[in-house]
Amino acid sequence: YCEVNGKPIRDGLSKKSECKHLPDLTNIGILAGHVDRWSNSSPSNFYKTALYDRAVELIPETKNYEIPDFKAKVVDGVYSSHNLACIRQMSNIGKVMNESVFWSASEMVYNHVVINLGDDLHIWEPLSIDQVLKGTDLTNPLNRKSSLGFPFSGQKKDDIVTGSYDKPVLKAWYANRIRMIIERMDKGLPPLNISTTALKDEIVKKGKNSRVFFSGNTEFLLLCRMYLAPLMELFMAKRDKLFAKIGMNAIGKEFDDMLQNMYAHVLKHATPDELKLFKSIVSDRLWIDGDYSKYDKLLVTLRYAIHIILWLAARTKHFKQNVLDFARLYLILKALHEYVVIIGQ
């Protein structure tokens, strides 16, 4: 438990969020003295209208939600800061006590993907930069209105692309930047996966203030699209058969179909007790919605997903014949769980 000038310090998002987990609090007084300083200090774009009271009448739960508040503040003597919330989240470190279970599950997923993709797996080849910018049959074109990310504060992706959406071209200075990164990768230097934190402008539950998300740098995004988008397309094309769900409609029968397919697969391997539990969860009701809470923060599990992708790449004709491309893919996947986060400004 920590105090500054007799006031408790916590991040305001959770009652369990006192700062006892922080190793160094020498600068916390400076932070607490500038409660109005935050990069997203502008007000939310949401505002209440005359329809709000009507919405509460129809759906009483509406009153449990509110417009986000982006400013750090002191309420009832408690300093609430999104910076601290983000630090707390990033300080949570998981540890796998028995790795054999995860490796067995990874091997099962790998075999399942190989069986269902079959020879289609050999379609997987890196995209050209033109394909990345324009998009393909299943992937969207680059969103040129979104942030360019680190280190180009305040700039949009539109600042690095010229031409129409049908014929986009990277500007020369940025194309040279990508070329330089790839040349460094060929010397064994991984690309940098650098994210900056920002606050989501979305309606949130009362007491939560707002949500923090990570905005990645565009260079790394382009590399991920070049080398991983073709595999994601294969996953999407076979999403009715795979447990790897990209672009799945989470609301509706498709989610239930996924669970039923998983149930059918578990039938072959489960113990009687596991079957009884799984059947009670899946078979006796229709599931129309689902979410994996904070899955993107569980970097321990990401390690195994990365290995599955490497195993799949090692089977393909292209990556067998192009050792340099396989080495680049390895460095990109390695950077996926060795990222740098810049909190606030």
Residue ranges of predicted features:
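Viral RNA-dependent RNA polymerase
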Residues: 1-345
